[in-house]
Structure formats: C-alpha cells, structure tokens
Amino acid sequence: MIQTESRLEVADNTGAREVLCIKVLGGSKRRYASVGDIIKVTVKDAAPRGRVKKGDIYNAVVVRTAKGVRRADGSLVKFDGNAAVLLNNKLEPIGTRIFGPVTRELRTERFMKIVSLAPEVL
C-alpha cells in the first residue's frame, strides 16, 4: 500500500533512483495505491546524466508493493520493496527498459508496454 509521503524505488532506466509519492490519483479522498494504480511523484534521487532531474514531478504506476497483491485463487504475491515506473502526461512509460519483476495485474490495455518490457511477469 502506497500513500502520500511513501518513498519508492524506480524500476526503469529514466535515471531516477528514488521517488516520493505526493498524491494518489483517483478521487479526492483516495488514500492508498496498490499495484497498477497511478500516483503523482517527485524525484528525490537521480543519476547525474539521466533523463529526469531531482525535483521533477511525474505520473507513475506502482509495479511492486511489499504489502502484496491477493489473487482470485487465494495466493498472495509480495515483494521486498515498493517500486514504480515513471510515466509521461499521456501515461506512457518514459524509460525504455524495466528492471525486476512485475505482476500480472498490470496486463491491462493501459500498461501492456510495461508488461512487454519487463524481464519477468509474476
């Protein structure tokens, strides 16, 4: 579960290393985001020659959470940490590579590009 002020690692090659959630999108009273949800983030740590700079604000989709995702068959998919992929204003991924596994819950029309770039889909 991701909420405002949560820090996430970045699972793409945009140059950002860590981001801070500043808003969970989807209604004024929405508090938590899970895998597949879109959040507004600011870059807190970035590589020197990356595509993004510290302080930039982007949309991002949550791809991994430590809380986990409950499946219909009762199984629970958890990860060691929280991670997100940065998106542009058209909700397309900014990076060209995805690092680490992503969950099957991202297999919607909006995020098929992320699923196809990911090295492993759980």
Swiss-Prot record:
Reported function: Binds to 23S rRNA. Forms part of two intersubunit bridges in the 70S ribosome.
Look up the record and give one Gene Ontology term from the biological process aspect.
Answer: translation
Q: Which domain of life is it from?
A: Bacteria
Q: Which GO terms describe its cellular component?
A: cytosolic large ribosomal subunit
| Species whose genome carries this gene | Cupriavidus metallidurans (strain ATCC 43123 / DSM 2839 / NBRC 102507 / CH34) (Ralstonia metallidurans)
Keyword Thylakoid found: no
What is this protein identified as? Large ribosomal subunit protein uL14
Q: Which UniProt keywords apply?
A: Ribonucleoprotein, Ribosomal protein, RNA-binding, rRNA-binding
